[in-house]
Design a protein with these regions (language model features):
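Positively charged n-region of N-terminal signal peptides that target proteins for export
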Residues: 1-4
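A generic "folded-domain core" signal
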Residues: 22-187
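C-terminal motif of bacterial Sec signal peptides marking the signal peptidase cleavage site
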Residues: 18-20
């Protein structure tokens, strides 16, 4: 249940960011106010972590979100038309505490405990790569993965200026996405 709620919240946030990114490049020809807003949002996302707080409608507690988009994009084969970017979404709620999820703008992750693909490899700055085991959201979608041991991920991300994530994708194999930020995660 908690993973499907996080998935929904982060998916909405990622879709908004993705749409803003896509629309920002398409809207260059239109010199209007909405283009300036979209360009501003896209530039903010490219710089690093974006933070958002909201109120849980059920208990009135604060929900904290931090999201960052990869600085690189990878072109997958058909049927995916747009380049694939990766998002890291960190959420904190009163009910569930901290959770870390990665989301792909296109493509499907592979995460199967039986064939040993249920992990991603993460490298913080120039430190040695670390394996983070993953699980799929409760709704069964394969465009997002939850990282086990969010406490460790957050601790390491707080000091990192560069994060690299190598994740396995259906048909496309393992791909590396890079996240660069001038300011480290504040959590």
């Amino acid at each position: 249940m908690k993973k499907s709620i996080l998935g929904i919240i982060c998916s909405i946030l990622a879709i908004a960011f993705t749409n803003s990114c896509n629309n920002a490049t398409k809207a260059k020809a239109n010199e209007n106010d909405s283009t300036a807003i979209e360009d501003s949002l896209y530039n903010e996302i490219k710089k690093g972590w974006v933070y958002k707080n909201s109120v849980d409608e059920m208990d009135g507690s604060i929900i904290k979100l931090a999201t960052i988009v990869s600085s690189n994009a990878i072109q997958f084969d058909s049927p995916y038309e747009d380049s694939t970017k990766l998002y890291i979404c960190i959420r904190n709620t009163k009910e569930y505490g901290n959770e870390v999820m990665i989301m792909a703008s296109n493509g499907q992750f592979v995460s199967n405990e039986f064939d040993g693909t249920n992990y991603v490899t993460v490298r913080f700055d120039n430190d040695a790569p670390i394996k983070f085991y993953t699980s799929i959201p409760a709704n069964g979608s394969f465009d997002a993965l939850f990282l086990e041991n969010p406490k460790k991920f957050i601790k390491l991300a707080k000091n990192a200026k560069t994060i690299k994530i190598k994740a396995p994708f259906f048909i496309e194999g393992s791909q590396v996405f890079t996240f660069k930020t001038k300011k480290s995660l504040v959590w």
